[in-house]
């Protein structure tokens, strides 16, 4: 049941966030304008590890950051396959540090 997906997420949440960050591209325009923000993206990791139904849960308020966040999830796919499809919500931080 859901218990397995919970275990998968507990063990892999940091890995999932790191993997997405690896594929995150800060648009040069957003960088130039000093735009920063936090985006929450929701998606399902299917049993073969692919990201499906990727959607914006909470916007950063900037289209370019929102788009980059969604793209990063698609590029980071596939992830380590879960025992059952798992729905994930991941915060993606854009900061110019």
What are these regions (language model features)?
Residues 8-41, 67-97:
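Short proline/glycine- and basic residue-enriched helix-capping loop/turn segments at helix->loop/beta transitions
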Residues 58-62:
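A short acidic/small-residue loop/turn micro-motif
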């Amino acid at each position: 049941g859901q218990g397995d997906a919970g275990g998968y997420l507990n063990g892999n949440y940091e890995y999932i966030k790191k993997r997405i960050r690896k594929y995150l591209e800060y648009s040069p325009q957003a960088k130039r304008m000093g735009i920063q923000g936090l985006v929450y993206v929701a998606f399902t990791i299917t049993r073969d590890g692919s990201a499906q139904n990727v959607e914006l849960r909470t916007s950063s308020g900037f289209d370019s950051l929102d788009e980059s966040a969604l793209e990063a999830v698609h590029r980071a796919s596939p992830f380590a396959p879960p025992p059952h499809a798992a729905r994930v919500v991941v915060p993606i931080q854009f900061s110019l540090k």
